[in-house]
């Protein structure tokens, strides 16, 4: 990480991320992280190391993007077309923005449409309504209400926005996987470089990419689980294998952060580094997420 000069400023260096830290950037980040889930494609079964060229993708500025970056590209494309997709009062209203209008915004460059598009449309409507009715029409007001506390903001997010409330039951106990809520806070912190709206006195929440951790030797899978992953078998939501992967994922992130914090690297920067490593080395990563 030190060799590559990875730091809090690295987030804004990506051309698809907002370059200016302002209220518009907050609304952009909220929309992206609201929809940042499940880009799995059945087409990827055919090629184990690289995404299929026929899978869902977004064409933007003469480039094609998949996964998380396709989401960023679609939103930027809409904003350039003067569609205010990051404005809650706009996207909450079916009169101002129809479901077909949302489908147009996330139109694919291939025949495969965005995965779980109906679920994403539902999340957009629901979140927009909450922001307008409870928070003055902007996620900025959620941040100010948190009073510079990441823990407070996490609570506000998970108590008010169903899409971010990721919970499961494991052996009779409720477990909480607030991955995207944590990423939302982390992205705001990174965009503002820990200042102004991105200033949190307790910024210590984040998650890690398990596939990259496996490749780096920080996480091991049992032979039976590896067989499932190698065969591209869909692991059911809330199943024991899924919950154990996600739980160990978080534990590894915490352990890794403890060993690196003395060098000025916190859990968020570590997560961004590992996520970028996974993206840049996806052809080397043999097993699915």
Which positions does each model-derived feature cover?
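Phosphate/adenylate-binding glycine loop and adjacent helical scaffold
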Residues: 1-178, 220, 224, 278-281, ...
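Hydrophobic core segments within long, regular secondary-structure runs in both alpha-
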Residues: 154, 158, 182-185, 210
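Glycine-rich phosphate/ribose-binding loops and adjacent secondary-structure elements
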Residues: 163-203
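Accessory, usually C-terminal, subdomains that scaffold auxiliary metal cofactors
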Residues: 186-254, 259-289
